[in-house]
């Protein structure tokens, strides 16, 4: 029984620590269509959204009159549907973003891309979301004669914590009661 509980805890921990998210394209259903105005396009939405390796894009659309094509940058710019990397027409398309860099998607229906039904997504590299802190400028310190050299000062950037470490700490804290049951 305790080994089963331990396996369950490990699976739960793995699930909590995984970073991939499922992101609904446009933030809601039926956004995969030619925009009604140039004020709010899918590219404006994607520019406000941070995408990481392991995230999945989910399109919900009417499969009877639309589709999703993953294309190269030049095909995206020209709205060229002739040689897609991949094509989807299921109405519930889910694509995992497995690498950093740009991804390009256009509608597979005649004239839709030309009317703005297209999406460019940029996936951040794994190192991009880490905080970069420059080293502080050197400071000349004059020590008083009574200064105790055995006391160590805290590092200048001690208040900075990697966000991933914080998530890991909370996940472990949540799992601690389960571990006590084993």
Swiss-Prot record:
Disulfide bonds: 79-113
Keywords on record: Cell membrane, Disulfide bond, Glycoprotein, GPI-anchor, Lipoprotein, Membrane, Signal
Keyword Lipoprotein attributed: yes
Covalent lipid sites (GPI-anchor amidated asparagine): 157
Tissue-specificity statement: Mostly expressed in flowers, and, to a lower extent, in leaves, but barely in seedlings, stems, seeds and roots.
Top-level taxon of origin: Eukaryota
Propeptide feature ranges: 158-182
SUPFAM superfamilies the UniProt entry points to: Cupredoxins
Membrane topology field: Lipid-anchor; GPI-anchor
Glycosylation sites: 65, 129, 148
InterPro entries: Cupredoxin (IPR008972), ENL_dom (IPR041846), Phytocyanin-like (IPR039391), Phytocyanin_dom (IPR003245)
GO molecular function list: electron transfer activity
Phytocyanin domain residues: 21-125
Stretch forming the signal peptide: 1-20
Cellular component, GO annotation: plasma membrane; side of membrane
Family listed: Belongs to the early nodulin-like (ENODL) family.
Alphabetized PANTHER family for the sequence: BLUE COPPER PROTEIN (PTHR33021), EARLY NODULIN-LIKE PROTEIN 10 (PTHR33021:SF519)
Protein name per its UniProtKB record: Early nodulin-like protein 10
